[in-house]
Amino acid sequence: MISNFAISRIEGKIESQDSLANQRFPKLNINLDKVSSNNNKLNVDYTFAADYLNGDSEDAKSIGYLKISGTIEITESKEKTVEILKRWDEKHSLPVDLAEEIINGLNFRCSSAGTLLAYSIGLIPPLVISMTKVQEKQ
C-alpha cells in the first residue's frame, strides 16, 4: 500500500514560443528507476516524462518536455517486502497489483502536477484519464 508520495524534481522546457502552435498531445512515459527497502518500507524511485513534438511522423521535432521525478514509499510486511525486492532484483518487475497501484497513482499525481507546470510554459496538459491495467508477461 502506498504510504507516501514525494516529488523531488520538476523540469519543463519549450524550444520556442512559435513552436507551441504545432504541438501534439505528449508522448508519456513512466519509468520505475530503482526499488530499495528500509525495514518494511519499499522506496520506488520514478520518473514521469512527457515529450511534446510538432507532429505525428517519425521525423517530428521536439518542441518541449516535462519531467517529474521522486519517490513513492510503500508499506508492506517484512516478508512481502523481501519477496518484492527479490522479484525486482531478478526480473526488474513488480507484482501486478502493486504495479497497477503505483502506475495509476503516478498517472493521477503527475498528471495533476504536470498540468500546472504545462500551463505555466504553454504546453498541453499531460493528462491520463483512464485506469491502467497491468498483465504478467506470457
Each model region followed by its residue ranges:
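N-terminal intrinsically disordered, cationic/polar leader segments
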Residues: 1-105, 119-138
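Helix-rich interaction surfaces within compact, conserved domain-sized segments
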Residues: 103-107, 111-113
